[in-house]
Amino acid sequence: MTKKMGVNAALNLFKTALSIIFPLITYPYISRILGVENLGKINYTASIVGYFSLIAALGISTYAIREGGRIRSNSEKLSHLGNQIFTINILSTVVSYLLLLLVVWLFIPNREYQILICIQSLTIVFATLGVDWINVLFEDFLYITIRSIIIQILSLILMFVLVKTANDLYLYTFISVIGSGISCILNLIYCRKYLKLSLVWKLDLAKHFKPIMVLFSGGLVISIYANSDMLILEWFKGAYYVGLYAVAARVYTILKNLLASIYSVTIPRLSHLFGEQKIDEFKKSYTQILSVVTLILIPMSAGLIVLSREIILFLGGIKFIDATLTLQLLAISLIGAIFGGILTYGLNIPIGRESVNLTGALYGIIVNIGISLLLIPVFKQNGAAVATIASEFFIVLYNFLVVRESGKYIDFVIWRKNLIQALLGFFSIIIIGFGVKLFVTNSLLLIFSITLVGIIVYLLELKLLKNPLLDHILDMVKHKFRRG
């Protein structure tokens, strides 16, 4: 991993970490003010809007980052590509809104749901006009991080000041999306330093259509199986159980996004290396990224299993206690989700294998919906969690079986050593966690003590095992202090 990639990963990790801290501050308050059912309504309508956000996005962001990464040194070609992509994105956004209006008119008579969808759908146009893919393409993660901090602080203040009762459902929803609007305005101004976008009448659809549609189809299918459990749960059991599932899914999603932030920033650089056929350098960088994620992911899932009850009580209170097992199941799913993500997004996208992602996601949704229909009527929110586990691990298995030349891009000898050390950390944290619970009963103290002791013991294990990645990080820190 190059120094630039390391800095970008650190910045993106920090930005995503803030997305954990801020919900930890706001969610306990919001869940108690709005209640289980209102949170279920918000999550249900958000899942509907999510599908139309995908139609508007059309896989364009990923396509722009990959293709732009290969030609970003040529300003003329990049400007042409940017204008083409921006115009296509505007057209897809218009189509998305027309389809959303039609669906709401025909299938969603509930007035409350209609208003929530109307508010949440603002994020669609904000995302299109925000053109955040330009910042990622030019690896300007410092700006992205600073912008994110400012917007999240503003949203936090507005929530605590304005949301006071369960009747503030619409106000809370509006505050949740207004950050996207502010981000959009800031980006429209800031991104002009890189690209001055404009609409064009002549589109080269023959060139862009197929790869964009493959990426869009893959994203749509992934979104369907990501949201299908929530939709099926609402259909069979109602908003209450969606609310229970939502609090566990929120923790799961936050941690998934945190880990994904490590590898998502590498797409422009890996695309550049692959475009120049620097395969050895590609293999070294990708293996390091995979190893770093593995060393963090496996022990993190163990900590989540141990602390699920305490986390649920902290976030939602005793009303959400039935979501404990749900979160423990999703902690297992987290492993499959991240390995699947680093294979599909971190490897297949840079090497142009997005068609594999699409096929794998199609099979994944069949697995997810099939198991959801079978288990949700009986096991409610826990059945939805099991369906998520099955689909996530299926996608990992499918990718390993289909991308047969993965050994060309991954050094499995190095990765296996890190995997074994991560598994050792997994069992250590499980033992430590349940051991500490014998002596400590306070939920917040449990979260703090198990997290602190678990991290210290795990780092000591890695040091004793002479893990090269940890040694490299420690050497960098020592060198930094000596220079300072």
Predicted feature descriptions by range:
Residues 21-39, 161-165, 223-254, 268-273, ...:
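Helix-terminus/linker motif at the lipid-water interface of multi-pass membrane proteins
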Residues 434-484:
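Membrane-proximal transmembrane or re-entrant/amphipathic helices at the cytosolic face
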Residues 1-22, 76-79, 83, 202-218, ...:
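N-terminal membrane topogenesis motif
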